Structure formats: structure tokens, C-alpha cells
Regions:
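Walker A/P-loop
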Residues: 47-67
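Conserved C-terminal RecA-like helicase domain
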Residues: 97-99, 103-116, 151, 155-164, ...
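Pre-Walker A (Motif I) flank of P-loop NTPase domains
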Residues: 46-53, 80-81, 127-129, 289-293
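Conserved pre-motif I regulatory segment
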Residues: 11-54
Length: 314
């Protein structure tokens, strides 16, 4: 791109402000994706093609797939529109939307509700477009109608599926039947001959898809977590008992379910005290803005409400 900064260079400049240590890895993955014969170069634009990007849990997958999108926009102008699919959660979809707007400043980025703005931008701006959607039937069907062949003029979509093993795969394959989300995604991919980039930390179910399925990846990429990453091997080592795992008495849940007593069992008390000390340190010493604690003592919602009341009383 002559005369102005490339999409990838601008993305990396923005990324440098918030996560500078991730930039070399993103650069390497983006370069491999567009230069290797196994990925973008293997796609013929006449039929769907799928690649899977694998990274550890909470290791920076969002930055890596957005970097790939920027590199693709530089390399291949035949992708005018990118779809970014998130889990079926408003908060996650909005978080991903904000991150995309912040980092992809050379793109026009749209919320799933911004159909009018999206359509206006097609004639008013030459920038690549990205639409961020939840994997939910309503927005997916809506954008399946919008992104028809008349609008695309025969050009394919570039679809990024974040947490690709969640929701999008066929959850009714043993019935046998096809789940709604899987059916919509399959139609979206097939009718637009899309390039489908699946992103996950747990690829097992994706690799087990039928060989002729559009969800079965034809190539794969993997990146290592950066310096300082603390993942499953740290918290749950195979050689020793994890320090983060503390076993409690078997009867603690029964005590928590007792409706006539507000007393908390010793295991939960210790967990709460540990959280309070940790939160104080993180907020006052490390200057973090928040610190959260998840308590999931039962699969029954009625238990959750009773136990919440006891904890609040405590």
C-alpha cells in the first residue's frame, strides 16, 4: 500500500500501545497465514476453505486473529467484508466489538444492529468492513439475508469464528439432525464460498468433523503463549498436587443447603478470606480496577440463591 500505512502496520502500532509483548507473535502468525502455501494461498475463491488457529486459554487469540484480518485486507482486496462471530453473549460480543474498533482503525467496524450504517458505508467508504455478531439465530439470519450475492457481487466473505468449538458445531448430530446455529453458519459459509478461520484453545471436536464438512479445517496454525503466561500447566501440574486446589469436606454442600442455618462451612470461609486478601493486594498494590470471585457450589439454581443469601449475611 503506497502512500499510507498498511492495515497490518496500523493494527500493530495500535496493539503496541496496549500489549507490546504480543506484537512479534502476531506479526509472525499474520505473515505465515498470508505467505504459507497451506492457508490463504491454498484458497481458490470458488469453494469454502477452513483454517483453524489454536492458542492457549487467555493467551491473546483475539489480537492474533485481528492481526490476520488486517494482513488479509492488505494482501487480498477480494475480501471486502469480514464477519467476526463471538459466543452467544451480549457482553462478550460488545467487548470484542470495542476491541476491534480500537485496534482496526483502518477498517469500518459495525455492530450487529448497524445494518443501515453498514449499507451506507459500502458506497461512501473504500475501507474493508467488519461486522461483529453473536452466534445467535436472530442476528445470524438477519445478516445471512443482508449478505446476499447481489450485495457481494460474487465476492466471498472472510469469516472468523471465535471459540469455534462453542455453539457453531452441530450439537444434534447423534439425533440425527442439524442444530439451528450450525445450519445457518453452514449456509453462510457455503453460499458465499467463504474463507472460514476457526479460533479455539480446544480444537478436538473441530478436528473430528466429517471430512467433507465445511467445518473440518484443511490447514492449521498455532502460536505459543507469551512470556509470563500462566496456564493450565502452571495451575494444575501433573507431577504434584496443584497449590490452587484445596479439597473440602464432602458434607460442605449439605451444610450450605441447610435452610435453617446461616453458618458457612470452613472451606468456603477460607475461600472468601483468601479472595479478600488477594483482592486487597490487587486493588491497592497492583492498582487493578477489579477483582472477581466465582462461587459455583451446585448445579441447582435454588441452591445458588440460598447460598448467596448466606454469603451476604456472612
Amino acid at each position: 500500500m503506497k502512500g499510507k500505512m498498511s492495515h497490518l502496520d496500523k493494527f500493530l502500532e495500535n496493539r503496541m500501545l496496549s500489549a507490546p509483548k504480543s506484537v512479534p507473535s502476531i506479526q509472525n502468525i499474520a505473515s505465515e497465514f498470508i505467505s504459507s502455501p497451506d492457508h490463504l494461498s491454498a484458497y481458490d475463491f470458488r469453494q469454502p476453505f477452513s483454517t483453524i488457529l489454536v492458542g492457549q486459554v487467555q493467551s491473546g487469540k483475539t489480537g492474533h486473529y485481528l492481526g490476520i484480518a488486517a494482513a488479509v485486507a492488505d494482501k487480498e482486496p477480494r475480501f471486502p467484508i469480514f464477519l467476526l462471530l463471538t459466543q452467544n453473549s451480549v457482553s462478550l460480543q460488545q467487548q470484542t466489538l470495542k476491541e476491534s474498533i480500537k485496534l482496526l482503525t483502518t477498517f469500518d467496524v459495525f455492530d450487529e444492529s448497524s445494518q443501515v450504517e453498514f449499507e451506507l458505508s459500502l458506497s461512501s467508504s473504500s475501507s474493508p468492513k467488519m461486522v461483529v455478531l453473536k452466534k445467535n439465530k436472530t442476528p445470524l439470519r438477519k445478516w445471512l439475508r443482508i449478505l446476499n450475492q447481489d450485495l457481494l457481487s460474487g465476492r466471498p466473505l472472510f469469516i472468523i469464528d471465535d471459540e469455534a468449538d462453542s455453539t457453531g458445531l452441530n450439537t444434534r448430530v447423534n439425533v440425527p439432525d442439524q442444530s439451528d446455529i450450525n445450519e445457518i453458519l453452514e449456509e453462510l459459509i457455503s453460499t458465499t464460498n467463504a474463507y472460514f478461520l476457526q479460533v479455539t484453545a480446544t480444537p478436538q471436536a473441530i478436528f473430528l468433523q466429517n471430512k467433507v464438512s465445511v467445518f473440518r479445517p484443511k490447514s492449521h496454525l498455532q502460536f505459543k503463549p507469551g512470556t509470563g503466561y500462566l496456564g493450565g500447566n502452571f495451575f494444575f501440574p501433573e507431577s504434584t498436587m496443584p497449590y490452587s486446589y484445596k479439597q473440602t469436606d464432602n458434607n460442605e454442600l449439605n451444610l450450605l443447603r441447610n435452610p435453617i442455618s446461616n453458618e458457612l462451612p470452613i472451606g468456603l470461609k477460607k475461600a472468601i478470606f483468601t479472595f479478600c486478601i488477594t483482592a486487597f493486594y490487587k486493588l491497592k498494590i497492583d492498582n487493578d480496577t477489579e477483582c472477581n470471585f466465582l462461587i459455583h457450589p451446585s448445579v441447582r439454581q435454588i441452591d445458588h440463591q440460598l447460598i448467596l443469601t448466606k454469603i451476604q449475611f456472612f
